[in-house]
Amino acid sequence: MAGYALKRLMTEYKELTTRPPEGIIAAPIDEDNFFEWECLITGPEETCFANGVFPARITFPQDYPLSPPKMRFTCGIFHPNIYADGRVCISILHAPGDDPTGYELSNERWSPVQSIEKILLSVVSMLAEPNDESPANVSAAKMWREDRAQFEKIADSLVRKTLCLPASEV
Amino acid sequence: MEGVMENVGGLMQNIRRRHMSITEMTEESVRLGVAQMDTGFKKIKEMSIMVLETGLRLPGLLFIELLWRYQGFSFEDISDDMMKQTPLSYFDIPTMLDFVHRRNFDHHAAIILSYFVIFISLMFLTLPLSRLIRMYSHFLSVFLFGVAYKLSAIYVDLEMKTGEEELKLDGLIKLERHGFHFLAQMLLVVLQSMLLEVDGEPWRVALPVFALPIVARMCGCPMDKLKNAHNYACTGTMIFIATYMLYRAPSLIKSTKTALRQIKAVFMVHGLADGVAVLWRKLRILELLTFTWITMFLMVLYVELIDKGRTWSEVGRILLTGVAETTNTPITLAALAVSVSYVCKWIADLTKLITGGTRSHGHVLAHSGYTEAVSVVILCIQTGFLGMQVEQKTILLALVLYIVISALLQSLFEIIEVVLLNLPSSPTASRARHARCICIALLLVVIPFFTTKTMLALLPIDIYTAIIIANSATVTARAIGVILKYIVLIVETKSEEPWEGIDDLTYYIDCANKGIELLAAKVVMVFGCMQVVKVGFSFATFAILLFHVIVNIYKRLEHTVSFIKNRNAAVKNINRLSKADVVQLREREDVCAICFIEMKEEARITPCKHYFHGPCLRKWLAVKMVCPLCYTYMKEDDFDSKSSSSGTLNEVQQNEEGAAVEENPENPEEQPEAPNAERAPGDMFDWDDLFGFRAERETRNRNEQRIHGARDMWPLLVDNDAYESDSDAGSEELVIEEENNN
């Protein structure tokens, strides 16, 4: 039933085009393939990721919205909840079903009433407030807890890298 | 925030503009063009090398084939009448036989000649391309030596006929014969020098030995001594060849050692199985077998059509006779299998090219034609195909080829099914592509009928033909089902609101398909039982029937029953919820939170008072029995209490009970005992291996069918490998927007 998912993706694309949320740009890669989207996420204000623009890619399954999509950043980003290869680990993208480890409540996992806009807003919120209790990047989580200045320094260098600016002289 | 966004946007545009300057674009374009040209040249070169290498290696297999075919004969038994019966009759066989008979070969010479031919054939098959070309040049130089010998003999005969005792060069006209012969000898010497790559002055001086009679005659040699000069030249040639071979022998031994060392390295690096695969690919055995079989088959067709004067109306029987006559040895059997494999692979690739479908996720062997090839080999081996007469081989080969066609049709169906079910959801697919896919699906409906008709005309009705007919009927039914599903999906894509009847239609199509499959299987079983009663009991037929009952009837029945049960459970879940009225929907002016489309005609109300489309909610409840919005559990007792409490709100309740009628499986008839009469061993046709392959295919089909049938109920099919070990803690406060509740 790929047509069912396609209609919903088209509706969401129309909605994102007419009422784009602040700091987020998302669209399909090309008109032939609505199941692969590309998006730009702006780092939230007053955080170490501020002024950064991070490209990411979202891949939708054929039975969307019954199953969640997969999201990964295509630039190098250093964050406790993002794997080294860019995959995003966030509760809204986890498949519905009770978490056996007990960290997540079931109503925070994927549901068909979620949308691309909510996914991206959750990712922006994750950038602002990392969750270091069950990290995807252990070294980033440890650094964020124990050496915040170093973490912010690395984040700032990554922001400059995404903007193609020279490295900071600090 | 907006100011920062504008600055960032402008900055990024400047950065992009600086990065994509005209110069860099130009350089990149030139680089890409050069790379594409290089790639094209490389591909053309590889293709040319492959064709050249295969063509050069072809005589090796042909020689081995001829040796195997005539290994039982001796030279005295070979006669003109027998040779004219063979496919090689348009060669100059009588002249060769006359030559052989007049030479009076004895037994030992024949053995030596056979070993020499085998050695040459193995060299053809195993040498690298450069050395293969050099070997051909050596053969050509030997041929040139023969030409030189012939010219020298002609010269001596001509001089003998003139009768002049003393050669007097008193006019230019008398130099004509001598000069031309000398010039011809020099030309041959130059060609040989280039071919043999002679690198030494003594070798070059020794080459023009057949010019000796001419020089001797021109120096005043008497007539009776001229033959001695010719004999000296022949002796010199033989000495030269022997010396050349002895001179080259150390190089040959060294090359052999190097080759063995390389082979050992290949096995050490890749292991045994992969090493065999590497050698197989490097020696181009597949291409060799295919070209060998095609060459012999074309020769047989030429003999049948041109020499025997048959017409084109007997093409089918001519083709079968040709295939039967060319398949006499294990080499040609392997060649036939490989050819069948390549033909099936080309047909499958052509179908993919026409439909524009991507490569499916099935096993790689399933789409390369290897299944058909292995089926051909195993069936021919088990029936003793190689030892049969031509008529028996023709009939059995027709049966084998129809089995191959049946397997090929199923492969094509697997290709077209994936493409047709995904095509309605791609927005920019052209109408031509839709038309092509529909045409191929219609061909899959028509071709099984044509195959069945021609098969019944050629072969008697048997348990084997019955199974082939059942498989053809199955392919036809599945193709019709895929076309109907395609139409339903097209209608769904073009409709505005999700259509509740669409799942019902898909479900009924699947049920009809499964019913037809079960019906065909039962007909085959009944026919087999009747044949056991009539003809008599045989272990082969009993084994076939038992395997058929287990694989085709019992497992399909089990799968169908589970499919129906899942469907009824889903229908029952959605029918417990009450339907919303059209007036209610107009008052709310709401959209379904699952598909984001307005609810105008139809909606279902959950116990927690949330509205969704019926089809959308049914799909989600198959994944998880909770409300998508508020995650309230919806259990069976909650339905009853909520629906009774909602009755007090004066809402219209329409509780439709789903049709939970389950089909009772019929018990298969017990097979009656028949008198124990065994058939001839040649008619024993063991289908276990064929059913092994077919069962494997049906296992994959069943898995795909289960996935596809289960997708109608939208179960959870996400691979959890990415999120296996790491799970995010629940510290994030994600407030679900309740706009839909307003």
Curated annotation (Swiss-Prot), chain B:
Transmembrane segments: 109-129, 138-158, 178-198, 233-253, 285-305, 318-338, 368-388, 395-415, 438-458, 463-483, 533-553
Chain positions covered by the region annotation Disordered: 642-684, 722-742
Cell location: Membrane; Golgi apparatus, cis-Golgi network; Golgi apparatus, trans-Golgi network
GO molecular function, one term: zinc ion binding
ZnF bounds (RING-type): 592-630
Ranges annotated as biased composition (Acidic residues): 659-672
Reactions the enzyme catalyzes: S-ubiquitinyl-[E2 ubiquitin-conjugating enzyme]-L-cysteine + [acceptor protein]-L-lysine = [E2 ubiquitin-conjugating enzyme]-L-cysteine + N(6)-ubiquitinyl-[acceptor protein]-L-lysine
CDD domains: RING-H2_RNF139-like
Enzyme Commission number: 2.3.2.27
Cellular component aspect of the GO annotation: cis-Golgi network; endomembrane system; membrane; trans-Golgi network
A GO BP annotation: ERAD pathway
Top EC class for this record: transferase
Purpose of the protein: E3 ubiquitin ligase that catalyzes the direct transfer of ubiquitin from E2 ubiquitin-conjugating enzyme to a specific substrate. Acting downstream of probable Golgi transport protein eas-1, involved in inhibition of activation of transcription factor sbp-1, thereby playing a role in regulating AMsh glial cell size.
Name of the protein in its database record: RING finger protein 145 homolog
Organism: Caenorhabditis elegans
